[in-house]
Amino acid sequence: MKEIKGVIFDMDGLIFDTEAIYYQAQQQAADQYNIPFDKALYREYIGIADEEAWESLHQRFAEHGKDTVQKFIDDSWGEAHRIFHSGEVDLKPGVRELLQFLEEQEIPRVVASSNVRPVIEILLEHAGIRDKFQAIVSAEDVKLAKPNPEIFNIARAHLGTSAEQTLVLEDAQHGVQAAIGAGIPVIMVPDMIQPAEELAQQTAAVLPSLHEVIDYIQN
């Protein structure tokens, strides 16, 4: 059994299958406003803070007009949040089993997500797992988004653990880079993008799902 005293979870694409929802909402809005958007382009924005992504979209699609690009952003954001509020968001494989295992081992858990707190709270409550986490660190709590390590440093402070005794679980490149920057071991469970070899070598492991995290901790 590894000496892990606390686990930090990303949320989008790791706990919940939200990336697919974000993509579908954006593609639907892009088609409506004749904006050339596809899954390859969406992948470029995975793990990037909302404000940074919106600014980039305005620059990329400036020729379509500021108002049109803003409608594209607002409509896609609104549709995604409608789905979130409805509770129609699937948990990723292994989430419940891993949370139960960590609870049994008395290993505390924190969510550290670039999403906003209301969305995090809604999704966790709908899934019935809000009480499985001792704290939440959200976009409102940091000045600098991932890949800056600030969010994980704050999360670790909630746990009261050393970096060596903490484990970060991430699905996206920016999150992995943030954990590495914080000096915290990180397991990547890729969602829509596989890691580059150089990045993968800097992780504690790259695993297909959260089911395998239990085996990692036990061995």
Please provide the spans of the model-predicted regions.
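Hydrophobic/aromatic residues within well-ordered alpha-helical segments
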Residues: 22-25, 46-50, 72-76, 80, ...
